[in-house]
Amino acid sequence: MKQPDRNQQQGAKSNRPAINDEIRAKEVRLVGADGEQKGIVSLNEALRAAEDADLDLVEIVANAEPPVCKIMDYNKHLFDLKQKQKDAKKKQHQVQVKEIKLRPATDVGDYQVKLRAILKFLEEGNKVKITLRFRGREMAHQQLGLAQLQKIEADVAELGVVEQAPKMEGRQMGMLLGPKKKK
């Protein structure tokens, strides 16, 4: 059986705090299990206090002079940290850019359907890219497309803000809307 690589073992220990016998300082600033300051004590005294409480001595701030150590249940501490990370990940919302495509001659009913979709995306906290595609002779009437994008901007004013003003890109005119910041 292959022996584990020494560098991997060292790396695994380096990203976690030193606990119990791994602490190398002669004196430490001790914090009790209840969070109260015990003052600066020798390492042996701190280890004895942790052992008496049937808990671990964990180095919280290693680069302080002397290092700050706390008496706690290390495994419970790790579990709590993982739970906090899980909860933070659940609450995190990935902002996506949704795209809505229109034509300059989009009729009123179709416009209302597209507008409802835009409002729904903005309520969910997503950005919306609106693309207006011109065909053939429609290129001569770009002001109609600009007027339609300005109408959309006015219709979504209470939920969204323009992040990128309307601009022509080849045969398409595009605009980017973002949700208004919640207070």
From Swiss-Prot:
Compositional bias annotation for Polar residues: 1-13
Main function: IF-3 binds to the 30S ribosomal subunit and shifts the equilibrium between 70S ribosomes and their 50S and 30S subunits in favor of the free subunits, thus enhancing the availability of 30S subunits on which protein synthesis initiation begins.
Keywords linked to the UniProt accession: Cytoplasm, Initiation factor, Protein biosynthesis
Quaternary data: Monomer.
A Pfam family matched in the record: IF3_N
Gene Ontology MF terms: ribosome binding; translation initiation factor activity
Transmembrane recorded as keyword: no
Localization per record: Cytoplasm
Protein name in UniProt: Translation initiation factor IF-3
HAMAP family with a match to the protein in the record: IF_3
Species for this entry: Acinetobacter baumannii (strain AYE)
One GO term (biological process): ribosome disassembly
Designated gene of the protein: infC
